[in-house]
Amino acid sequence: MESYDVIANQPVVIDNGSGVIKAGFAGDQIPKYCFPNYVGRPKHVRVMAGALEGDIFIGPKAEEHRGLLSIRYPMEHGIVKDWNDMERIWQYVYSKDQLQTFSEEHPVLLTEAPLNPRKNRERAAEVFFETFNVPALFISMQAVLSLYATGRTTGVVLDSGDGVTHAVPIYEGFAMPHSIMRIDIAGRDVSRFLRLYLRKEGYDFHSSSEFEIVKAIKERACYLSINPQKDETLETEKAQYYLPDGSTIEIGPSRFRAPELLFRPDLIGEESEGIHEVLVFAIQKSDMDLRRTLFSNIVLSGGSTLFKGWSLPSAPCPRKLPQSCQAQTPREMTRESPFLPIQVLVTGY
């Protein structure tokens, strides 16, 4: 096959998230495959012939047998820490269990978080060109693609996933690098914070596979409180969660205390802005003539924006902004007023 014919083939799209990796072909409405971005290794000695075979497990098989495995994520806060495991996961994407295609025959669109180290991008390119021999590679910011998915070319994308939270203002298809805001507080930090609260309530989840149970509890039981100070004084309704072994646990105030970390990173000693401040600061760093348009086109993306309680156009804003922001921000952004002139879209799979 000639090189031109190869480049003209349908590109492979790999959304390389810190917690979940999604893969498919360009032009499809949804990803073809989606699985956790981790590698599992057996932590027990194999003593029977019929035991699970293999030293490394990825994808659905790792999910199915995670109780026997030591789970390790190759990415932390959007940056690859273990390139050997990351390469194994990408190899699995092309395997017969996933896309069932040859990497040499398809260009690749790879996503990454903004403001990542340049070395991270260079190493990814090196792996795809030298190991997988792809004919072409394009690395794009996740936020830009989220805006494209809504059919818009102007807006500000607040993307909060498993490893990174960032706000990216885009105007008529142009991202504004000087206005991009990023904090390394996201879903995995909320899961760890929830695990700490559950331990205080008498439920101990210490192994790497049990951490995935905490993550599932977070996704199903946690919510954002509009007024956390008030909820602390009230008798919080407890939610029951069924564990894989059939037992149940009751979760109380931890349901709203853990996600509060997104708005108050100081709860774990981090000196960074909350997710609501990141959004406003990113818009404020943009040109004054563009701010009203950006405030009118806010796109939420990423798994950590799926908590119950995220503000919709008819609901009050979950957090009051600092006094320094309120003077330059539409008054509807404060807690007491609804999001009347602001259009919020939620995108994701």
Curated annotation (Swiss-Prot):
Residues bearing the modification N-acetylmethionine: 1
Domain of life of the organism encoding this protein: Eukaryota
Locations listed in the record: Cytoplasm, Cytoskeleton; Cytoplasm, Cytoskeleton, Microtubule organizing center, Centrosome; Cytoplasm, Cell cortex
Record keywords, A-Z: Acetylation, ATP-binding, Cytoplasm, Cytoskeleton, Nucleotide-binding
One function term, GO molecular function aspect: ATP binding
A GO CC term assigned to this protein in UniProt: centrosome
Pfam families in UniProt: Actin (PF00022)
Keyword ATP-binding in annotation: yes
Protein family per UniProt: Belongs to the actin family. ARP1 subfamily.
Subunit composition and interactions: Part of the ACTR1A/ACTB filament around which the dynactin complex is built. The filament contains 8 copies of ACTR1A and 1 ACTB. Interacts with dynein and adapters such as BICD2. Interacts with BCCIP (isoform 2/alpha).
Described purpose of this protein according to its UniProt entry: Part of the ACTR1A/ACTB filament around which the dynactin complex is built. The dynactin multiprotein complex activates the molecular motor dynein for ultra-processive transport along microtubules.
Name this polypeptide is given: Alpha-centractin
Source species taxonomy: Eukaryota, Metazoa, Chordata, Craniata, Vertebrata
